[in-house]
Amino acid sequence: MQEFTNPFPIGSSSLIHCMTNEISCEMLANGILALGCKPVMADDPREVLDFTKQSQALFINLGHLSAEKEKAIRMAASYANQSSLPMVVDAVGVTTSSIRKSLVKDLLDYRPTVIKGNMSEIRSLVGLKHHGVGVDASAKDQETEDLLQVLKDWCQTYPGMSFLVTGPKDLVVSKNQVAVLENGCTELDWITGTGDLVGALTAVFLSQGKTGFEASCLAVSYLNIAAEKIVVQGMGLEEFRYQVLNQLSLLRRDENWLDTIKGEVYE
C-alpha cells in the first residue's frame, strides 16, 4: 500500500471552521483539539466571514440545515473558493432532503476539496439508485463497482476534488487514484457524530497542506485505528465515546501508526 506522510506533529495550530450540527458540535471541537488544532463554529451570516477569513480550512456539514444556515454556508463556501481555502462538504441527509441535495450540487461551483458522505448519500448525490433512510446508509447500497466509475467521471469534471465515501470499507476517489480502506469497528456506529468527526479531521489534515485524497485517507484511517485500539467486550456507550476522544489524542504520539492502515491504493 502507498506510504502516506505522517502529518504529526502538527506544524501549526490551525483554526478549523466547522459549520456543523448541534448534536456533534462538541465531539468535533474536542477531536480537532486532540490533533493539535483549534476549532471554531460560526454559522450566523452576520459573522461567518469574519471567522472563515481567519481559518486554515472549512468544514461544512449539512446536519440541521436552516434558511439562515444555508445563507451562511453559501457565503463561507464562496469565500473559500475565492481565497483557495481548503473545504470539506459533508452531504448529510441528501438521500432524503431535496433541499440538501440541491445545496450540495450548488456548492460544487465553489470547488470543494472533498465531498464526504456514506454510501447511500454519495449514490444519491451522483444519481445512482439507493436505499438510504434519513441520514443512515443502507446495507443494500454497499456495491461499489458502479459507484467507483461514476465518481471517477465526476472527478474528471471537477479535477481538484476528491470523494470520501464511508462504509464497511471506506472509499477515497480522486482524478487519478482510488483507495479502498479497511480499518474500523462496528462500535463506531454506537455513538452519533463519528461520521461528522471524520469530516472535521479531514479538514485538519487539509490545513496542514495535504491533498484532498491524502487528507481523506489519513482522517478516516486515523479515527478507525484509534477506535480499534479501545474495543473491549462489554464496554458501554459513554465509556466507548470517551475512549475514542482519548485515543485520538494518544495515537498521534505513535510514530508507526501509519503502518497499521489496512487497504489498497490504486492508480
Curated annotation (Swiss-Prot):
Keywords assigned: ATP-binding, Kinase, Magnesium, Metal-binding, Nucleotide-binding, Thiamine biosynthesis, Transferase
EC identifiers of the protein: 2.7.1.50
Residues that coordinate or bind substrate: M41, G193
Annotated coiled-coil segments of the chain: none
Catalyzed chemical reaction(s): 5-(2-hydroxyethyl)-4-methylthiazole + ATP = 4-methyl-5-(2-phosphooxyethyl)-thiazole + ADP + H(+)
Superkingdom of this protein's organism: Bacteria
GO biological process, one term: thiamine diphosphate biosynthetic process
Keyword Metal-binding annotated: yes
Essential cofactor(s): Mg(2+)
GO molecular function, one term: magnesium ion binding
Keyword ATP-binding attributed: yes
Residues holding ATP: K116, T166
CDD domains hit by this protein: THZ_kinase
Family from the record: Belongs to the Thz kinase family.
Protein name listed in UniProt: Hydroxyethylthiazole kinase 2
Organism: Streptococcus pneumoniae (strain 70585)
Organismal lineage: Bacteria, Bacillati, Bacillota, Bacilli, Lactobacillales
